[in-house]
Amino acid sequence: MSGFDDLGIYYSDSFGGEQPVGDDGQAKKSQLKKRFREFLRQYRVGTDRTGFTFKYRDELKRHYNLGEYWIEVEMEDLASFDEDLADYLYKQPTEHLQLLEEAAQEVADEVTRPRPAGEETIQEIQVMLRSDANPANIRSLKSEQMSHLVKIPGIIIAATAVRAKATKISIQCRSCRNTIGNIAVRPGLEGYAMPRKCNTEQAGRPKCPLDPYFIIPDKCKCVDFQTLKLQESPDAVPHGELPRHMQLYCDRYLCDKVVPGNRVTIMGIYSIRKSGKTSTKGRDRVGVGIRSSYIRVVGIQVDTEGTGRSAAGAITPQEEEEFRRLSAKPDIYETVAKSIAPSIYGSSDIKKAIACLLFGGSRKRLPDGLTRRGDVNLLMLGDPGTAKSQLLKFVERCSPIGVYTSGKGSSAAGLTASVMRDPVSRNFIMEGGAMVLADGGVVCIDEFDKMREDDRVAIHEAMEQQTISIAKAGITTTLNSRCSVLAAANSVYGRWDDTKGEENIDFMPTILSRFDMIFIVKDEHNEQRDMTLAKHVMNVHLSARTQSSSVEGEIDLNTLKKYIAYCRAKCGPRLSAESAEKLKNRYILMRSGARDHERETEKRSSIPITVRQLEAIVRISESLGKMKLQPFATETDVEEALRLFQVSTLDAAMSGSLSGVEGFTTQEDQEMLSRIEKQLKRRFAIGSQVSEHSIIQDFLKQKYPEHAIHKVLHLMMRRGEIQHRLQRKVLYRIK
């Protein structure tokens, strides 16, 4: 309790010229309290046919009997009962909320009589407010809104521990022991200014010294309070600017309502407090009237629901009807896939996989309390210039909750969570990173291969268990990170080298098995495809400024975003019995196929086929069912999920040594290529040159296939060991 004696924490609440309340003011307050009491007692819902129910009276009684001394009042109900009352509460919430709480206490006293023995004294009631008005933005808060009710959306990124704050204090003079009791302390982060002088005058006693008063902790009345840090939503931040923050003050039953990572909408009073200690030097006197702002919270709505999904915002019945029509289309899967990044040509399978990732499977809670993730993770590996980053950028815009980050610019703490010291209390607090903020959405990680190995290991738990466990600086806790991961990476050699096989992939099997689908994207040379691609790119550049009509069958971005949010909120399909049986048989075949391949090549694949991959196919099937708003994933969905898995992960696993258009390279072919290379290096020394035609003829005489000779020459040129000279007729060895 020694903290109460520290005089430095009490701030003056005398900012602004408040007038003393006279008889008129007291009469007006009594009148307003009476009207608030009538509202709580008489407001009713229902019609003549169905019968009326007294909404707030019944709610007060129910809450009070359960030992929950709070009630939530809707501003729209208050406005329909008495518009002036609602206006007073909007314009001057600090004093009128106090009157509303006193009125609620009086009504609770009436409706809960007779109370059991020992509970005769009525408890104080906390009134929370909620409103359906359009929310403002942290950036739009100006001095005009000071001391008004505001509604702000955002993400909670930090929360302090719950502490006690005095609401009524008793002070005593050190010298003459004069006690002043029951002094009300203003709510919020403002404190109380202790009197400088003791006014007690006793004959024959010296005057009391300056600052004689101290607080008697035992006679103080305290409530719980907690401060939160709110960051504005990523979609509200203008491009190129940092997200802004706002400090929140919660008390009583509003404490411990939210955790870092929750998306919330706050109803609160925009308030000010003294901004730290200012130095007495001349240059700082200009800051005397400057106050820092915070919001005193009077209501919290958590927008991320229990399953970690973004609640489908305000969807109108017309939109719902449109979504139902859309889901009933037989080609909805193709339509959604075409609507993903329409400016990027081709990559149809990758777009279909991204569609599955956006909709996601169903999260399951098992009877023993464990959970199975429903989110799909996707990795794109391959050549530069294959529109990987463009797809990631589109997904960030298209997902209801999307966070984009680049591998090199992301640390383990930035992706998961960091522990830092609170500048006010000097205690350690925790701030959530990208994967916590994207709870219920998608994290896009570009340049995944450029990340440090230590940072990549940090997201192992987040990808499979969908939690982030922290044990730092005395804080041991677990945060939710129920999000999909879409990652893009390049090959070790920059471009994909077909002869190197698995050496192209520089990832551990532990991280690869956490991805449901792994696509190897190659920039293949094909004249017809190159021509079509060039035409498409030219059209995109030429019609960039013109507002062209959407391609046939496409859904516009806003509709797609709302449709994804709607499907994720409303639908959680499961596998049907027939599709489960089919999937079981196919999985056994896949395992045996991968095992045979490993036996043939005498080396283990770095992309394993495990039970995780079986669960991956289940998730992909469920996401296809969710796209159509179906309760069960059918056999057709399982077929498509298996096909997607086949063209992505299975092909990548089997391509231990793919040799382009020639198909699989066996161990013998690999040995033959290495024999040709050794002979070639023996043929001519470093710094010498030989005719290319004569070398090819010599090897052909030794019965080596021509394509193998050309492949070895091509590889040695890419590695910079030989180069062409004299109009590409002569080969010159550099190293």
UniProtKB/Swiss-Prot annotation:
Gene3D superfamilies: 2.20.28.10, mini-chromosome maintenance (MCM) complex, chain A, domain 1, Nucleic acid-binding proteins, P-loop containing nucleotide triphosphate hydrolases. It comes from the Eukaryota. Coiled coil: none annotated. One of its GO terms (cellular component) is chromatin. ADP binds at R372. It comes from Xenopus tropicalis (Western clawed frog). Its EC number is 3.6.4.12. Component of the mcm2-7 complex (RLF-M). The complex forms a toroidal hexameric ring with the proposed subunit order mcm2-mcm6-mcm4-mcm7-mcm3-mcm5. The heterodimer of mmcm3/mcm5 interacts with mcm4, mmcm6, mcm7 and weakly with mcm2. Component of the CMG helicase complex, composed of the mcm2-7 complex, the GINS complex and cdc45. Keywords: ATP-binding, Cell cycle, Chromosome, DNA replication, DNA-binding, Helicase, Hydrolase, Nucleotide-binding, Nucleus. Acts as a component of the MCM2-7 complex (MCM complex) which is the replicative helicase essential for 'once per cell cycle' DNA replication initiation and elongation in eukaryotic cells. Core component of CDC45-MCM-GINS (CMG) helicase, the molecular machine that unwinds template DNA during replication, and around which the replisome is built. InterPro entries: MCM, MCM5, MCM5_C, MCM_CS, MCM_dom, MCM_lid, MCM_N, MCM_OB. SMART domains: MCM. A motif (Arginine finger) lies at residues 513-516. This is DNA replication licensing factor mcm5. Its main location: nucleus. Residues 332-538 form the MCM domain. The gene is mcm5. GO terms for biological process: cell cycle DNA replication; DNA replication initiation; regulation of DNA-templated DNA replication initiation. It is found in: Nucleus; Chromosome.
